[in-house]
């Protein structure tokens, strides 16, 4: 059973009551998920801290709660940070790389490559600075807030797709897997140490914006080289990095923690104690969402 807890913050306790018996509890992201609900669950619990530990501190309360049998993190740096803080031991933390769904991200055969260079993603200050330099020397297409089928179309149309980190922290973004799944050529800023990709075989990595600009010129002139590398990336992600592969990894670990017992999956008395905390966290997020919407409206009006 899957519950979108962000969508159902207001009635999350009711939703959990409706689930009935289950074998495992798996929480992804976990921002402002009630600790009281976790305490009420009598089955093995797992947490996927899918954002960088260094910049998403709202995960701290879950990571140091001691309530999870095992935790999955975004990078090796995240794993080291958690262990150094004494929150978890090494055997309780696993790096879980991102992946993709082949039904959502795929090559479009015969599509015209009419976009020279594409950046697709959220526009933050660091990226804006890089792109302002890049667009002086090439035809750059910027796509912000584009997802789903529209994203797949753009990525397939591009000769070169750029990957630029949102901050100074090195990362291996989900977008990498999605672009390679479209069999598109990827030119990326240097990736984090846990990247499964080989520079020059699956994609091309650069050290700085100047090298990215010079690499754009080189690879725009060589469709054969772009095709060779994009084929390598496509084969790599299809073989190793689909969400099905990730699910198989999770299942193998979940089953190692399997417990039999006559107790209920959720302790109703403990769950009742979580009502007040759940209401507070719902109201907190409702007010924050209202504030963000108001701020966006004001900025849009005076832009």
Task: Report residues per predicted region.
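Conserved short-loop catalytic and cofactor-binding motifs
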Residues: 167, 200, 234, 238
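Nucleotide-sugar donor-binding catalytic core of glycosyltransferases
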Residues: 1-22, 27-40, 44, 49-199, ...
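Conserved acidic donor-binding segment of nucleotide-sugar-dependent glycosyltransferases
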Residues: 203-209, 218-223
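C-terminal amphipathic helix plus adjacent low-complexity
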Residues: 216, 221-303
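Short beta->alpha junction loops/turns
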Residues: 123-124, 208-209, 243
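Short, hydrophobic/aromatic alpha-helical segments in well-folded domains
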Residues: 67, 175, 215, 232-233
């Amino acid at each position: 059973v899957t519950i979108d807890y962000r969508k159902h913050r207001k009635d999350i306790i009711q939703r959990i009551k409706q689930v009935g018996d289950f074998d495992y509890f798996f929480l992804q992201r976990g921002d402002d998920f009630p600790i009281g609900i976790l305490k009420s669950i009598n089955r093995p619990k797992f947490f996927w801290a899918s954002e960088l530990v260094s910049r998403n501190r709202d995960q701290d309360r879950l990571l140091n709660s001691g309530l999870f049998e095992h935790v999955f993190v975004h990078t090796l740096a995240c794993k080291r940070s958690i262990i150094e803080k004494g929150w978890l031991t090494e055997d309780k933390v696993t790096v879980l790389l991102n992946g993709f769904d082949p039904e959502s991200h795929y090559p479009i055969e015969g599509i015209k490559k009419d976009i020279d260079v594409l950046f697709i993603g959220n526009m933050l200050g660091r990226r804006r600075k890089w792109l302002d330099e890049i667009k002086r020397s090439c035809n750059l297409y910027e796509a912000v807030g584009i997802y789903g089928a529209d994203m797949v179309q753009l990525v397939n149309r591009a000769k070169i797709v750029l990957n630029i980190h949102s901050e100074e922290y090195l990362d291996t973004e989900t977008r990498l897997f999605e672009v390679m799944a479209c069999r598109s050529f990827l030119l990326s800023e240097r990736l984090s140490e846990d990247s499964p990709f080989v520079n020059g075989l699956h994609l091309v990595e650069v050290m700085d914006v100047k090298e990215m600009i010079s690499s754009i010129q080189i690879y725009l002139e060589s469709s054969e080289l772009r095709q060779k590398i994009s084929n390598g990336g496509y084969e790599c992600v299809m073989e190793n990095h689909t969400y099905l592969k990730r699910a198989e990894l999770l299942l193998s670990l979940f089953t190692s923690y399997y417990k039999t017992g006559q107790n209920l999956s959720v302790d109703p008395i403990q769950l009742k104690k979580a009502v007040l905390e759940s209401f507070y966290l719902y109201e907190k997020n409702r007010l924050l969402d209202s504030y963000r919407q108001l701020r966006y409206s004001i900025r849009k009006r005076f832009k």
